[in-house]
UniProtKB/Swiss-Prot annotation:
This is Maltoporin. It comes from Actinobacillus succinogenes (strain ATCC 55618 / DSM 22257 / CCUG 43843 / 130Z). The record marks 29, 64, 97, 265, 385, 429 as: Greasy slide, important in sugar transport. Residues 1-23 form the signal peptide. HAMAP family: LamB.
Amino acid sequence: MNNKKTLLAVAISGMMFATSAAAVDFHGYARSGIGWTSGGGEQTALQVNGGGSKYRLGNETETYVELKLGQELFKEGNKSIYLDSNIAYSVDQQVDWEATDPALREINVQFKNFAEDLLPDATLWAGKRFYQRHDVHMNDFYYWDISGPGAGVENINLGFGKLSLAVTRNTEGGATATYGTDKVYYIDDNGQIQSRFEERKANVYNDVFDIRLAELNVNPNGKLEIGFDYGNAHTKNGYYLEPGASKNGYMITLEHTQGEFFGGFNKFVAQYATDSMTSWNTGHSQGSSVNNNGHMLRLIDHGVVQFSPKVEMMYALIYEKTDLDNNQGKTWYSAGIRPMYKWNKTMSTLIELGYDRIKDQSSGEKNDLAKITLAQQWQAGDSIWARPAIRVFGTYGRWNDKFNITDRTNAGYKAKDAEFVAGVQFEAWW
């Protein structure tokens, strides 16, 4: 293990050296810190029971790093070929030496202007990629994200907008809802060779076909993006999905971006998904499941406004209703704001207020969580997006669970309680 880690460190050091020796681009993201919880022990994250995201400020408990290296490998006129990569790490920030295997998040090649005469400005790409992801920064919620291994052509200039076509895959490894049979030989108690058929499990391959039409000018400083994603599951010959598995589904997305919006921007998003696309509601598909037949409706409004040269604010409103045929769906309500007051160009104070509610489809019961964070921050510039940043924070959260209570109590908490967290964190992107 030590040799493995040493070789990895040498490889990264070599790549870092290459950034100064050749035209290699080095980008990335990182966060880390230390925190304490009023109930004792290390910092704990405050997240609504049944929810998939949380308001981030003063509420992140892991060390997370993405290291991106890329280089233009070919350039001729307007044509160019770019190699991009991304290795990610995540540890619990508990001790000095925390060993973890890296995750290869991206490795792809992008050929810009590959068909300059026929498709000017279009890019042909293939490989693993973060593909045109859309998210709410405050709670790290990726509402449109089909990232994975794939291929496509993007930014085809149609004159009135840009068209992108892609296919990506997310495989369900050894999915429990996928079956086949193997003939197995064995020796019985009498020493005779016998045979029987045993059930086996195998992967389910979910392909997502993505069509996007972006940069549609619909009003002054306003642009519309329209997307359609179709997910379809398939298996190897000799295997089959469990009866009732969703197998396929689709998701439709409309996103309006308003620029020059009170000194910032506003995004309004409407999404509708069916069946296999309702498991995560992001654009990824889970066709092996028998528990995701149904539909989802989501509305999001988020952005940034600048009230004065001294004050900026992030905001987010989310409504998501998933109605499932088995009555196991949920409705998610979320609202948050993060105002920032700038004392000078490199020092600021931030407050984040976040509220999440999950309503159970079958019982109508609700789980709630509210949190407030006060943070003093030193950052590289006077924008709310300025990074790197070092922040000292205090966070107070209160929750009240009415269903799936054991998910909370099994983790050592009461169904209705509160917690105070304090700590120091840095965050950087470059």
